[in-house]
Amino acid sequence: MEDIKNLINGWLLNKSNYLAGKGEINLSKIVSKGLIDRTIEERQNDIKKEIYKEIDSQILKIDLESQTSSRIVVLVELNYLERILKNSGEFVNETSLNPLKVKYILGFSNKSWKLVDFVSGL
């Protein structure tokens, strides 16, 4: 379960940095192309709106929902805080969810586990 927690933490940290405009998204080893594309699209929409997001999240709890040889589903509770700011730094909005419940789906391919999808706000 610690490996799954590390993988999800890696995703959350990299996604957060990317949506804040800090660097590129570099997750192809642990996240499916579909999720990476979704995140890039979200950032491109933010750029058009001249905003960025600062996201702080912390895993509180992970429960295994189901597991097969090629798929793992976990339910995760997060402390989640998202701030939306204009490129000038001006505050726009803030969302705080404690906890935010998210279902993460991991798939096994090319000899490793990857995050393939998630559903938040359960």
PLM features per residue range, with description:
Residues 1-55:
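Core segments of small alpha/beta cavity-forming domains
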Residues 2, 51, 66-68, 93:
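Short, solvent-exposed beta-strand/turn "edge" segments of beta-rich domains on protein surfaces
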Residues 54-57, 96-98:
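Amphipathic hydrophobic-ligand
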Residues 70-122:
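Exposed beta-sheet edge and beta->alpha loop/turn motif
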